Amino acid sequence: MKKPSKKSEIEFCTVCRFHHDQGSRHKYFPRHKSSLSSLLDRFRSKIADVRFFLKNPSVLRPQEQSQNRVWCVFCDEDIVELGSSFACSKAINHFASSDHLKNIKQFLSKNGPAMDCIDEFRISEADVAKWEKKCQSFGNEDASFEGSCGQLSGTSNDIHTKLAFETMDRIKKVPAHHINSYKSNDVMPLQYNTNEYQISLSEIPGVIHNGSYLNMDDSQFPLCDESGNGFGEHSIPCRSKDYSGNGNYCTQENYQVSQDKKQIDGSYNPPGVVGMTSISSSHSTDAGGNVHSGAPPPWLDANDGDFSSVQLNQSDVARFQAKVPGKNRKLNPNRVGAAWAERRKIEIEMEKSGHVTKSNIDPDWLPNFGRVWQSGTRKESRKEFEKEKRKLVKTESISTESEPVKIQPYISKRARRESGE
């Protein structure tokens, strides 16, 4: 009677990445062979990259040392080029070591294939000696970097760094006053909040208010006086579209503001500046408009907390405030727009009691996007859309019915063919 074959001990295959009890015959299975061939092909591509730096040694930058790394499948070791002066120097020395050769033989004897491919996965000592001589031709490893920018003293294949350094050298050679003399006329960012500073130049011809900026025509204003603009030696001729150093605009001499004219609230003129228009920090309470024309929103109004617009005495204000529901009193009084909300509640109570309130807020401050974005539900918006669609179909049908219909007799293909002949 034949005895059953004894099973081998369970072991882990590093190539297939699973445990098995098949023993030494596992390396002849098709799955193991395919996994082994793909693993060795990946390692051949890695060692080919290392051989490239073996023939062409190049200096390794400190910021690239952590990225230059190789995983050795035979030694189960991650080779990181930390502290290396040349690219793949540690990997070259590792692949030429005797321990690496020993691990290759153990791996191939356990997992296959034959031993005739050992030289494909290692580097000979003769190649390492040639590489060391080439590295010595670069000079000392400590003097391989030149300057704080990391520019190489020897030859380098890094064209991006070379171009970057050449660009920086060209920029440094350009004088500062040449750069300042070419100011762009692009849109500048807001210097102040919309509700803090408003430019009042309504009397000046050629000035158009557009949001928080001014559009001025060059033909309306001459150049400013260079001697008195207070910019020092390299003075810049400032046109009407250009900003000055403090955010003001250049205008005609007949609109100059002298230093002695302090009666305007919020106006300020720096000493030594001639030909500058005064900018008033006071905001006109009668100004309307929407968000595009620079009007302040009602919750950021400068008169928050001031009920002067509501023409009532203190007793009436206290009486209307007492009518506010108790749950609203629990809200944070320092929240955004709290003063505007309180004022609006009082105005609503006044409207209910019959008082007439004056409001300077433009109802079109925010643009009207229509339908569900402005008011109403999605269902109501859909009904409005369907009504408009039906009206459009009716108008199209009426326009088509108005045209006279031409009725033509049917002509067969044979008759058309004969008439064509």
Curated annotation (Swiss-Prot):
Q: State a single Pfam family of this protein.
A: CCDC84
Q: Where is this region: Disordered?
A: 279-306, 376-421
* Entry keyword annotation includes Repeat: yes
What tissues has this protein been observed in?
A: Also present in cotyledons, hypocotyls, stems, veins of sepals and stigmas, and actively dividing tissues such as shoot apical meristem, root tips and emerging true leaves. Weak expression in petals and anthers, and not detected in mature leaves. In seeds, expressed in both the endosperm and embryo.
Q: What is its main location?
A: nucleus
UniProtKB keywords: Brassinosteroid signaling pathway, Metal-binding, Nucleus, Phosphoprotein, Repeat, Stress response, Zinc, Zinc-finger
GO MF terms here are: zinc ion binding
Function of the protein: Key regulator for endosperm and embryo nuclear divisions.
Q: What is this protein called?
A: TITAN-like protein
Name the species this protein comes from: Arabidopsis thaliana (Mouse-ear cress)
Recorded name of the encoding gene: TTL
